[in-house]
């Protein structure tokens, strides 16, 4: 049983003594925290049995990797780790409790042990600290670590349901409360809430801790440490560092800082930010640098110590330590490095006199802040549109109201769900959760507005930022008022206090002042409320009602505001503006004018903020003079007839509007400007007309070539410059190229005529080349994918390069012949599938053999800088350069062809690639692999006898789907890869579809391309320009070790020969010692032959036909944009076909999930049961396995989908794979494998080792050269 407050308080103020003790040290020197616990546990290489110990030897779930259980099962190991850190110089050690909440432990089935786990961990750390304190004579401290849990309050686990949460605030509070009790009972000195990726979770932890300190325990010092996940300077849930500090400072932490995710060098700017916005001490315990490609940490103790010493010398820190990858050696060096450095001196105040609020971003309201607009339209009582949407349950559309308010200038967003037909707490929770999913809205603080305190609490539990509560009052007396205010303070919110007490609503000036003054002193004296967090609403009441007693309501508010601001330091004044003009509802022009006039004066008297319709407030000086005077008279009560006069004004004034007239004003400019404008804007309409006008101007352009070299190239140069500067995007560039091609196409007949005439006159042909250089592009032999290559060609063409595009499946000899025939300056090779890599190596070898010494560019989805540097560049003595995408191609080609730059550029590439090769070969030496036998022993072993029996498909054999309805596939299209084709990538928080449309940089262009795609898609479907065909098949199947055998229908597998075999590859790269993950192979998901349990395997192949023909037709019309668009859509339709057919397989064709009801977004997040891995991809990287699919289902004969010699599918818009139904099956990557598996695999497949190595080159864990 937990001790009571009385038990733990033998004398005055333990917290004061302990906090003062630590604070005294912090004022004298920099303290040192310990390093990574997980890192040290891994060094012990503990087995599953070690993790289980005797107590848990029969536990149903694996426990290896559950480091926290070791405090119970292996306390000596944890004690020794603590001791090592203490002897290395740590002043403070953290308990081994990062995942010791019931929430995190539920993954291991140990949630019932959370309290015990924490108490034991605290006890182990306490003993280590006391032993070393006694040994060294230096007191050491124990910090009880409260980790973030594996669930989040601010982010939905479901893309389709942004309002859904799989944990509640109250559940988190209870879990943290249980954890903190165990830590406190175990004897910790400090509570450290750490690795905060979601501030809402941290606020739940702080709420729990504060509750314990209030009710049961003597308070301890609290440390808070957030985690900035990348260089954007934000937490995983999107908050900036300053917003994070504002959100948690209500808990009065002794220390606040950052840990994890970043190395010290990367963390520095964010630690500086933390220090500038807190009066607390600053702690900093980064990782040992950034993780390498294997997820390990390489930063040496010395390097890390020097970084942290720089922090200390510059006065940034009070406590330093280490997180992931750090060891006692790191802590020893860090302690030595900072021991003579002076600690940071915390400022006495920060942002003095400011109200500090936060959403994802900070918002400071100070003496010089302009009037703060609190957006009013997200109020079911104040906005008919919003109310209608909420009542209909259309919360996503209601978000648009919130977004519009922010866009129109609302700095805070008021949310009100008070309606008798609504479940207020539920509606508030749901809408606030929706807001959290939209960073453009969530960036501003929220004002949780309700007359029902249960609704207010519901809203507060959803907000990771520091928000405003609107409102509380003295209406129900002081006890009720203080109870609510105490809760609000515990949530860390500011509060609006209404001028309302036991006697009712204050309408006169003096009662307003009296009620507000009373409330102010209660909050400060009884609760220690920060005066800067108090907002008074002295009641803006309706004027112009026709009742004389209402005429002074505006004047009374303004006068009360002046006194409140003069006599209640720090307090702010707000009010609901729409109340003022309620008598004039329906007369929006009058109401807006009244609001503008009222605010003009109220702000002068000290009103700080107001709930307004952001964006609809007129400027005082812009109000019509007659209307202005009438409003002034009404507000100041200067004319008893003011109301009647305003009504008369409204009735006599008509409404006017303006028409927006669009003109083609650019058409009035000079010819050259018109040509350039058309090219830059991608306007085709007049290009032939203008080009012909230029051609007819023989005086200025005597030859057609002069037009190309002059205004057309000038326009394309502007396009290239804008694209290079990131001010123009790929779809726009391609539209510009389309215009250019039409112009050039118009001129070509005239140029050919001129050439013939020259030949007749002189007997020879002029050698003209206006281009910057000639580049031959080709997709290599056996590969049919060319969207990326085509885009590169268009971009290069726009930058004055002559591009010779040889298309797809181009043999080496054809590539080299074209390069010689066209006197190419550069060759560019493209490929998507892994066999293309070998073909690229072959081309490089041939170029070397034939002494064709021109630069070779390598690109395509399967290529990489490492493969280019290691496998291709050594075969060729001229430049070989990997090009990431079209935007990089121009820069690379320009440098390679610039006489002044090319040699230096080539030298840089040689040095860079040599470094890459060295790193690669070093990494091969360091990698460790299990033997194939060990990997199989540690495979994924399903207890088939206890599993539900596999479902038999509704048919065995194959079924063909002819001319599949494309309209059915549209909803299954995943649009993200579509935007990747066009190199349109939104930045956080606007990544993915449809958020990309909100991106400030690419959003507008993305929407245009998407609209073009929708138009083309509907035309393709309605005009039946494309056809979809596919085949699905199912067979009895059993696994034998790593292979899957298929059998004829009706055969008894144990007594029959298989009709086909799919050969599997198993993971071999050694996993982290703390990991209990199995070494997977696809065969693990099929019942073994010896089990006697019948199982089944499915396969499919689908394609979209007609794409190539349409694309070619567009190219012949000089329309690259439409050519690329139809290919991109063809690929999307093929993938959608695969997705839709897999759904049908699960629900009806196989029927193992007949009741499945998943949203499309859940399909993309792989939330369905079973998998559909494809040969040639991570779970089975061998493309030769496609041959078995094709033979078994007679794919080419039945569908027309064929395989090239490199086993690419043709047409390119095609997808194929296998169907697995086991509920435990999952996607995985085989990763690198060692030679013993290659030899075994070659033997099973009856192939030579060399042939297998050729097909599996990218996953070989050894070098074959």
UniProtKB/Swiss-Prot annotation:
<feature type="binding site">
    <location>
        <position position="886"/>
    </location>
    <ligand>
        <name>methylcob(III)alamin</name>
    </ligand>
</feature>
<feature type="domain" description="Hcy-binding">
    <location>
        <begin position="19"/>
        <end position="338"/>
    </location>
</feature>
<feature type="binding site">
    <location>
        <position position="537"/>
    </location>
    <ligand>
        <name>(6S)-5,6,7,8-tetrahydrofolate</name>
    </ligand>
</feature>
<dbReference type="InterPro" id="IPR036594">
    <property type="entry name" value="Meth_synthase_dom"/>
</dbReference>
<dbReference type="Pfam" id="PF02607">
    <property type="entry name" value="B12-binding_2"/>
</dbReference>
<keyword id="KW-0479">Metal-binding</keyword>
<comment type="function">
    <text>Catalyzes the transfer of a methyl group from methylcob(III)alamin (MeCbl) to homocysteine, yielding enzyme-bound cob(I)alamin and methionine in the cytosol. MeCbl is an active form of cobalamin (vitamin B12) used as a cofactor for methionine biosynthesis. Cob(I)alamin form is regenerated to MeCbl by a transfer of a methyl group from 5-methyltetrahydrofolate.</text>
</comment>
<dbReference type="InterPro" id="IPR011822">
    <property type="entry name" value="MetH"/>
</dbReference>
<dbReference type="GO" id="GO:0008270">
    <property type="term" value="F:zinc ion binding"/>
</dbReference>
<keyword id="KW-0486">Methionine biosynthesis</keyword>
<feature type="domain" description="AdoMet activation">
    <location>
        <begin position="923"/>
        <end position="1265"/>
    </location>
</feature>
<feature type="binding site">
    <location>
        <begin position="382"/>
        <end position="384"/>
    </location>
    <ligand>
        <name>(6S)-5,6,7,8-tetrahydrofolate</name>
    </ligand>
</feature>
<feature type="binding site">
    <location>
        <begin position="782"/>
        <end position="786"/>
    </location>
    <ligand>
        <name>methylcob(III)alamin</name>
    </ligand>
</feature>
<feature type="binding site">
    <location>
        <position position="1172"/>
    </location>
    <ligand>
        <name>S-adenosyl-L-methionine</name>
    </ligand>
</feature>
<dbReference type="InterPro" id="IPR000489">
    <property type="entry name" value="Pterin-binding_dom"/>
</dbReference>
<dbReference type="InterPro" id="IPR033706">
    <property type="entry name" value="Met_synthase_B12-bd"/>
</dbReference>
<feature type="binding site">
    <location>
        <position position="830"/>
    </location>
    <ligand>
        <name>methylcob(III)alamin</name>
    </ligand>
</feature>
<dbReference type="GO" id="GO:0031419">
    <property type="term" value="F:cobalamin binding"/>
</dbReference>
<feature type="binding site">
    <location>
        <position position="579"/>
    </location>
    <ligand>
        <name>(6S)-5,6,7,8-tetrahydrofolate</name>
    </ligand>
</feature>
<keyword id="KW-0028">Amino-acid biosynthesis</keyword>
<dbReference type="GO" id="GO:0005829">
    <property type="term" value="C:cytosol"/>
</dbReference>
<feature type="binding site">
    <location>
        <position position="470"/>
    </location>
    <ligand>
        <name>(6S)-5,6,7,8-tetrahydrofolate</name>
    </ligand>
</feature>
<feature type="binding site">
    <location>
        <position position="324"/>
    </location>
    <ligand>
        <name>Zn(2+)</name>
    </ligand>
</feature>
<protein>
    <recommendedName>
        <fullName>Methionine synthase</fullName>
        <ecNumber>2.1.1.13</ecNumber>
    </recommendedName>
</protein>
<feature type="domain" description="B12-binding N-terminal">
    <location>
        <begin position="662"/>
        <end position="759"/>
    </location>
</feature>
<keyword id="KW-0963">Cytoplasm</keyword>
<feature type="binding site">
    <location>
        <position position="591"/>
    </location>
    <ligand>
        <name>(6S)-5,6,7,8-tetrahydrofolate</name>
    </ligand>
</feature>
<feature type="binding site">
    <location>
        <position position="585"/>
    </location>
    <ligand>
        <name>(6S)-5,6,7,8-tetrahydrofolate</name>
    </ligand>
</feature>
<feature type="binding site">
    <location>
        <position position="709"/>
    </location>
    <ligand>
        <name>methylcob(III)alamin</name>
    </ligand>
</feature>
<dbReference type="GO" id="GO:0050667">
    <property type="term" value="P:homocysteine metabolic process"/>
</dbReference>
<dbReference type="InterPro" id="IPR050554">
    <property type="entry name" value="Met_Synthase/Corrinoid"/>
</dbReference>
<feature type="binding site">
    <location>
        <position position="449"/>
    </location>
    <ligand>
        <name>(6S)-5,6,7,8-tetrahydrofolate</name>
    </ligand>
</feature>
<feature type="binding site">
    <location>
        <position position="323"/>
    </location>
    <ligand>
        <name>Zn(2+)</name>
    </ligand>
</feature>
<dbReference type="GO" id="GO:0009086">
    <property type="term" value="P:methionine biosynthetic process"/>
</dbReference>
<dbReference type="GO" id="GO:0046653">
    <property type="term" value="P:tetrahydrofolate metabolic process"/>
</dbReference>
<keyword id="KW-0489">Methyltransferase</keyword>
<dbReference type="InterPro" id="IPR011005">
    <property type="entry name" value="Dihydropteroate_synth-like_sf"/>
</dbReference>
<keyword id="KW-0949">S-adenosyl-L-methionine</keyword>
<feature type="binding site">
    <location>
        <begin position="1227"/>
        <end position="1228"/>
    </location>
    <ligand>
        <name>S-adenosyl-L-methionine</name>
    </ligand>
</feature>
<feature type="binding site">
    <location>
        <position position="974"/>
    </location>
    <ligand>
        <name>S-adenosyl-L-methionine</name>
    </ligand>
</feature>
<dbReference type="Pfam" id="PF02965">
    <property type="entry name" value="Met_synt_B12"/>
</dbReference>
<dbReference type="InterPro" id="IPR003759">
    <property type="entry name" value="Cbl-bd_cap"/>
</dbReference>
């Amino acid at each position: 049983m937990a001790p009571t407050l009385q038990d733990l308080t033998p004398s005055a103020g333990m917290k004061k003594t302990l906090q003062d003790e630590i604070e005294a040290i912090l004022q004298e020197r920099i303290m040192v925290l310990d390093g990574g616990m997980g890192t040290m546990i891994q060094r012990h290489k503990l087995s599953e049995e070690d993790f289980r110990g005797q107590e848990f030897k029969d536990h149903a779930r694996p426990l290896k990797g559950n480091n926290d259980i070791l405090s119970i099962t292996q306390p000596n190991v944890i004690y020794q780790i603590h001791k090592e850190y203490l002897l290395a110089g740590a002043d403070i050690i953290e308990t081994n409790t990062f995942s010791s909440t019931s929430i995190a432990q539920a993954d291991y089935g140990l949630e019932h042990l959370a309290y015990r786990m924490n108490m034991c961990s605290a006890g182990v750390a306490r003993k280590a600290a006391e032993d070393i304190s006694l040994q060294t004579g230096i007191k050491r401290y124990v910090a009880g670590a409260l980790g973030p849990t594996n669930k989040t309050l601010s982010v939905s686990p479901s893309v389709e349901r942004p309002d859904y949460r799989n944990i509640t605030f109250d559940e988190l509070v209870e879990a943290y409360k249980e954890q903190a009790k165990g830590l406190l009972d175990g004897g910790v000195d400090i509570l450290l809430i750490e690795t905060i990726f979601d501030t809402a979770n941290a606020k739940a932890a702080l709420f729990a801790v504060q509750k314990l300190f209030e009710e049961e325990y003597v308070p301890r010092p609290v440390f808070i440490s957030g985690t900035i996940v990348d260089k954007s300077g934000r937490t995983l849930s999107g908050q900036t560092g300053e917003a994070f500090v504002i959100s948690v400072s209500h808990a009065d932490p002794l220390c606040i800082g950052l840990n994890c995710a970043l190395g010290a060098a990367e963390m520095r700017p964010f630690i500086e930010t933390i220090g500038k916005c807190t009066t607390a001490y600053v702690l900093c315990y980064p990782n040992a640098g950034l993780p390498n490609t294997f997820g390990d940490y390489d930063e040496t103790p010395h390097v890390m110590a020097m970084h942290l010493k720089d922090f200390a010398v510059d006065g940034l820190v009070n406590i330093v330590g280490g997180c992931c990858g750090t060891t006692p050696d790191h802590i020893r060096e860090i302690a030595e490095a900072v021991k003579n450095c002076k600690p940071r001196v915390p400022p006495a105040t920060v942002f003095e006199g400011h109200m500090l609020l936060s959403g994802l971003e900070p918002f400071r309201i100070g003496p010089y802040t302009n009037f703060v607009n609190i957006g009013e339209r997200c109020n079911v009582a104040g906005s008919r549109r919003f109310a209608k949407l909420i009542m209909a349950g259309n919360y996503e559309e209601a978000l648009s109201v919130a977004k519009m308010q922010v866009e129109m200038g609302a700095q805070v967003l008021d949310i009100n769900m008070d309606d008798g037909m609504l479940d207020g707490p539920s509606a508030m929770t749901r809408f606030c959760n929706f807001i959290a999913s939209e960073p453009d809205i969530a960036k501003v603080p929220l004002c949780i507005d309700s007359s029902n305190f249960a609704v207010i609490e519901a809203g507060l539990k959803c907000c990771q930022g520091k928000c405003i509560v609107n409102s509380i009052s003295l209406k129900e007396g002081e006890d009720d008022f203080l109870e609510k205010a105490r809760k609000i303070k515990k949530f860390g919110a500011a509060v609006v206090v209404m001028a309302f007490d036991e006697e009712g609503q204050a309408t006169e000036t003096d009662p307003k002042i009296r009620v507000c003054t009373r409330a102010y002193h209660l909050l400060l004296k009884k609760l220690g409320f920060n005066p800067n967090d108090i907002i008074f609403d002295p009641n803006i009441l309706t004027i112009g009602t026709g009742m004389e007693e209402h005429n002074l309501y505006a004047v009374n508010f303004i006068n009360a505001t002046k006194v409140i601001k003069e006599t209640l330091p720090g307090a702010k004044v707000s009010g609901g503006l729409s109340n003022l003009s309620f008598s004039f509802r329906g007369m929006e022009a009058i109401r807006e004018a009244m609001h503008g006039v009222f605010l003009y004066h109220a702000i002068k008297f000290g009103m700080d903020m107001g709930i307004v319709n952001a964006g609809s407030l007129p400027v005082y000086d812009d109000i019509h003079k007659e209307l202005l005077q009438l409003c002034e008279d009404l507000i100041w009560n200067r004319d008893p007839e003011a109301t009647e006069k305003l009504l008369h004004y409204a009735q006599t004034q008509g409404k006017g509007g303006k028409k927006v007239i669009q003109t083609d004003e650019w058409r009035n400019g000079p010819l050259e400007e018109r040509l350039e404008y058309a090219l830059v804007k991608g306007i085709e309409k007049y290009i032939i007309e203008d080009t012909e006008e230029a051609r007819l101007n023989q005086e200025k352009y005597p030859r057609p070539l002069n037009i190309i070299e002059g205004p057309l190239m000038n326009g394309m140069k502007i396009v290239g410059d804008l694209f290079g500067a990131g001010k123009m995007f790929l779809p726009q560039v391609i539209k510009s190229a389309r215009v250019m091609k039409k112009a050039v196409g118009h001129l070509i007949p005239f140029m050919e005529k001129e050439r013939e005439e020259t030949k007749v006159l002189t007997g020879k042909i002029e050698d003209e080349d206006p281009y910057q250089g000639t580049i031959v592009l080709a997709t290599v032999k056996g590969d049919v994918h060319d969207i990326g290559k085509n885009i590169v060609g268009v971009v290069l063409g726009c930058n004055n390069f002559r591009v010779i595009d040889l298309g797809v499946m181009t043999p080496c000899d054809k590539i080299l012949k074209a390069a010689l025939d066209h006197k190419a300056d550069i060759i560019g090779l493209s490929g998507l599938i892994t066999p293309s890599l070998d073909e690229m190596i072959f081309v490089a070898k041939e170029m070397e053999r034939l002494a064709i010494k021109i630069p070779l560019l390598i690109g395509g989805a399967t290529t990489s800088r490492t493969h280019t540097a290691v496998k291709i560049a050594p075969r060729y003595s001229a430049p070989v350069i990997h090009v990431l995408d079209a935007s990089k191609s121009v820069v690379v080609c320009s440098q390679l062809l610039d006489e002044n730059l090319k040699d230096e550029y080539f030298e840089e590439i040689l040095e860079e690639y040599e470094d890459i090769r060295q790193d690669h070969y070093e990494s091969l030496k360091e990698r460790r692999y299990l033997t194939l036998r060990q990997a199989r022993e540690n495979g994924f072993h399903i207890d088939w006898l206890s599993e539900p029996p596999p479902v038999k498909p509704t048919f065995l054999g194959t079924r063909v789907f002819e001319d599949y309805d494309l309209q059915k596939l549209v909803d299954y299209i995943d649009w993200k890869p579509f935007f990747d084709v066009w190199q349109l990538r939104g930045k956080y928080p606007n990544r993915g579809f449809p958020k990309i449309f909100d991106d400030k940089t690419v959003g507008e262009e993305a929407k245009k391309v998407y609209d073009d795609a929708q138009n083309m898609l509907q035309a393709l479907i309605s005009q039946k320009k494309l056809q979809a065909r596919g085949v699905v098949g199912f067979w009895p199947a059993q696994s034998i070790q790593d292979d899957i055998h298929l059998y004829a229908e009706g055969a008894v597998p144990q007594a029959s020969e298989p009709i086909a075999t799919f050969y599997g590859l198993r993971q071999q790269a050694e996993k982290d010692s703390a990991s209990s993950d199995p070494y997977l192979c696809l065969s693990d998901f099929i019942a073994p032959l010896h089990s006697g349990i019948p199982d089944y395997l499915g396969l499919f192949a689908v394609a979209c036909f007609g794409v190539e023909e349409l694309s070619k037709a567009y190219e012949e019309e000089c329309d690259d944009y439409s050519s690329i668009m139809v290919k991109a859509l063809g690929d999307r339709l093929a993938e959608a076909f695969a997705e839709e057919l897999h759904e049908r397989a699960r629900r009806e064709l196989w029927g193992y999930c007949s009741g499945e009801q998943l949203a499309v977004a859940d399909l993309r997040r792989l939330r369905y049961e079973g998998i559909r891995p494809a040969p040639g991809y991570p779970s089975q990287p061998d493309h030769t396995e496609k041959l078995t699919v094709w033979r078994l289902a007679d794919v080419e004969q039945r569908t027309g989908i064929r395989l090239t010699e490199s086993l690419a599918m043709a047409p390119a818009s095609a997808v194929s794979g296998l169907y697995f139904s086991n509920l435990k099956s999952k996607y995985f990557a085989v990763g690198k494998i060692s030679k013993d598996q290659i030899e075994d695999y070659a033997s099973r497949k009856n192939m030579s080792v060399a042939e297998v190595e050729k097909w599996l080159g990218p996953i070989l864990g050894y070098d074959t050269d």
